[in-house]
Amino acid sequence: LALLVRSTVREPLRGCMDAAPPAPMAASREALRALFAKRSYFYVLFGGALHALSVYGLVIWIYVFMERVHGMSMKEASVYIGLLSLLFGLLGVALGGWIVDRLSPKDARWFLWLPSLQAVIGAPFILLFLYLERLDLALASYVIYWVLAAGYNAPVYALIQSLAGASSRALAVATYLFTVNLIGLAIGPLLIGFLNDELRSVFGEQGIRYSMMVAGLTNVVAVIFYMAGARTVRRDVASSC
């Protein structure tokens, strides 16, 4: 796909859609310094990483959860969860993008208010998914949670692009992805695995419910970072135009 895009799509002039003329390319160190000078970039970086810690942890362990708690085979769990995650994940991202496109021009704080709302509203649904005994109700709760969990990506990535200058947008996204993968993908599944081992002696096979609950609710901690970033995001976005 990368080769196809490279050979068929013309590279647009950087900054041609910005209000100000494109600035000359800055050194990576200078570009990073300029990014972190905007406090909302720092907060969205770690808010998004904590949000991802929750999502990655649940995604990795959800199949084991379905096997242990609901007695499904790994094949059945893969079909059910895989299809639901694909369909409703796409819906969540599209819906998140649609909402933030309409709200952020009125107030840039919606770039961070929206993922905050998604995290807070999604929290009770992940608890319902983990603790409901009826499979149909548990899966319905998962669908609602997953639409909200996937949807946070749209406002977060949109904000990162809005904060970065035309010559440093790739660096801004790369730094975000590095942080998200370092914290979210490295720590999220490991945290659930560690808690599984610790809680299994007390709760048996049901211990996975509690370990996934801890990881699932870390996205609420991300709200603290999002709301802190919302205090300066309007000024930071305006200074990037």
What is each PLM-predicted segment?
Residues 73-76, 110-113, 196-219:
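A membrane-interface helix-boundary motif in multi-pass transporters
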